[in-house]
A protein has these predicted regions:
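Conserved donor-binding/catalytic loop of nucleotide-activated donor transferases
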Residues: 176-178, 194-198, 220
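C-terminal amphipathic helix plus adjacent low-complexity
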Residues: 235-307
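Conserved catalytic-core segment of nucleotide-activated headgroup transferases in glycan assembly
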Residues: 89-148
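Short, acidic/turn-prone active-site loops that include or flank metal/cofactor-
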Residues: 6, 39-45, 64-65, 163-169, ...
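Active-site and donor-binding regions of nucleotide-sugar-utilizing enzymes
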Residues: 1-69
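Donor nucleotide-activated moiety binding/catalytic core segment of transferases
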Residues: 5-8, 148-191
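A nucleotide-sugar donor-handling region in carbohydrate enzymes
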Residues: 54-114
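Nucleotide-sugar donor-binding patch of glycosyltransferase catalytic domains
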Residues: 199-262
Length: 307
């Protein structure tokens, strides 16, 4: 197995598998004799899978908490529902190494541009005032993960020593040692934390897909922060384009410059004090997993039948 960009020029692989990047599948389908698309966002109401996708199979994650609308897979060649992909072993590893009491994951922040720089700064201001400062005042061991360059530039300087840089494996290792992971509502991180057995708390969403993810999991009992209580819950139920949803959410984020509390101190405290869900409850949300094995089996069967 090699990354597409690392293959010798002019080579065609027996198969190309693109994971969580169905848009790029249209570009790389010519890189291999066969193309398999693994998607985690087929459930999004506003984002049916891209038209013009020619693939040997479209494997979409369908989790109990996020069922996929039938219209989102209509017209896609060979759609196959699979369980959650990837993540660590279901049980957290036993380790004597000390980790941080709290891991704060700020992945998903968009790189600042003239249009959104102040939105990013306002969002991080909310997190700093309501979560990071109180944790630090209590002396809680804390790590902040995400785009380290962006965070170093946009977070207040007093948090510079808490920012961690590393790859996904290093982030997962940090989470495995933490008592609680407080994270942006990204699906991959939520799934991995629930598989691992982490206690988890959800930060307020930054975009429409995060809002929809957050609403589903908050309704199921995971603790988290909503923008100004329930006032955005209606938006999660609307069938609208992502850019319009982002524009609405950005207005709520910018309003925090006047009213930065967003939620009660008790609600923020709930993130820090979150308890891990039982395996039974986690399975009711994300299923038993095994999506990566389903992908491997499909490739094995396809190539066995054709040989």
């Amino acid at each position: 197995f090699v990354q597409v960009g690392e293959a010798p020029s002019g080579t065609r692989a027996d198969a190309v598998v693109t994971v969580m990047n169905s848009k790029r599948a249209i570009e790389i389908v010519e890189c291999g004799e066969r193309c398999y698309v693994v998607d985690s966002l087929a459930w999004l109401w506003d984002a049916p899978s891209p038209g013009g996708l020619v693939a040997d199979a479209y494997l979409y994650q369908e989790l109990p908490a996020l069922p996929v609308p039938e219209r989102n897979i209509q017209g896609i060649p060979r759609p196959i529902a699979i369980g959650a992909v990837g993540g660590p072993d279901p049980q957290r590893p036993v380790t004597d190494e000390a980790g941080s009491d709290i891991v704060v994951n700020l992945a998903g922040l968009r790189a600042p541009s003239p249009d959104n720089k102040e939105v990013v700064r306002a969002y991080l201001g909310v997190i700093a005032q309501n979560l990071l400062d109180p944790c630090r005042a209590e002396g809680r061991p804390l790590q902040i993960w995400g785009n380290a360059t962006l965070l170093a530039d946009m977070l207040p300087e007093r948090f510079a020593d808490l920012i961690e840089a590393g790859d996904q494996e290093q982030f997962s290792e940090a989470c495995s040692k933490a008592r609680v992971v407080i994270t942006s509502p990204g699906l991959t991180t939520i799934v991995e934390c629930l598989q691992r057995g982490n206690a988890i708390g959800l930060l307020p969403p930054q975009n429409l897909s995060q809002l929809r993810i957050s609403e589903r999991f908050l309704a199921a009992g995971i603790v988290g922060i909503r923008w100004n209580g329930d006032s955005l819950s209606w938006l999660a139920r609307q069938d609208m384009p992502e850019p319009l949803g982002v524009e609405i959410i950005n207005k709520y984020i910018m309003a925090t410059r006047e009213h930065p509390s967003v939620a009660t101190p008790a609600a923020w405290r709930g993130l820090v004090d979150a308890q891990a869900l039982s395996r039974h409850v986690a399975d009711k949300l994300i299923g038993p997993g095994g999506g990566e094995r389903a992908v491997a089996r499909l490739l094995h069967d396809d190539f066995t039948q054709s040989s």
